[in-house]
Amino acid sequence: MRLLIFSDIHGDKAALEKLMAVEADYYFAAGDLANFGRGLETMGPILQRRAERMYVLPGNHESEADIARFCREFGFHDFHGRTMQIAGYHVAGLGYSNPTPFDTPGEYSEQELKERLQRFSGLRPLVLICHTPPKGTALDRAGEGKHFGSDAIREFIEREQPRYFYCGHIHEAAGQQATLGRTAGWNVGKRGQLLELPTLVK
């Protein structure tokens, strides 16, 4: 099974067109299709050609209500706080970011991120898709080497050791890869990342 995961389109129609030309079994938009919630409606028709296989998370630029309405309108799957099984793997999604200085609509406190991640505890093998990266890795390194990721997400990864982790949010880290214990992680950015999941035999 092929999963295409991407993030931080921020209204870039050309980037989205390129992604939708990629053949995959599942598509995961990991947040920030728009800017402060504006322009989502212009992204919908581009994504719609993959509608039945499109799973969407809110980033920090969208609210839960924005994404719920967007998914209803265009026939996508709202994947915020949800799980599914693909080829024997659990796949889980959590949108929003930890607090930012910009007062964006999709932010949780670290405590709320921790509590929401708890529902994914014990799922193995796990593919975890979040908008926000873990703190203190190549995935959250911004300008001047500063790190802006989430402590709660890092703690969850270190404890639960998902097989794969995907995120966005920090634009400067797009395309970066990091390993936390047995977890392989990527900041997918607007170019996206393909994950080939072999079917697990039980």
Question: Which residues fall in each region the model found?
Answer:
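N-terminal active-site segment of His-dependent metallophosphoesterases
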Residues: M1-P45, R49-R50, E64-A65, G122-R124
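Active-site neighborhood of phospho(di)ester-bond hydrolases with catalytic His/Asp-centered motifs
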Residues: I5-S7, Y27-D32, M54-N60, D78-H80, ...
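Conserved catalytic scaffold of divalent metal-dependent phosphoesterases
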Residues: G11, E62-G149
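A generic local structural motif
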Residues: K13-E17, L40-P45, A65, H77-F79, ...
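Binuclear metal-dependent phosphoesterase catalytic core
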Residues: A15, R69, T83-A87, T104, ...
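Short amphipathic alpha-helical segments
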Residues: E17-K18, L40-T42, I67-F70, D140-A142, ...
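Short, structured coil segments at secondary-structure junctions
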Residues: E23, R50, R72-G75, G181
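Cap/insert and terminal regions of metallo-dependent hydrolase folds
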Residues: A34-N35, G39, A51, H131-I170, ...
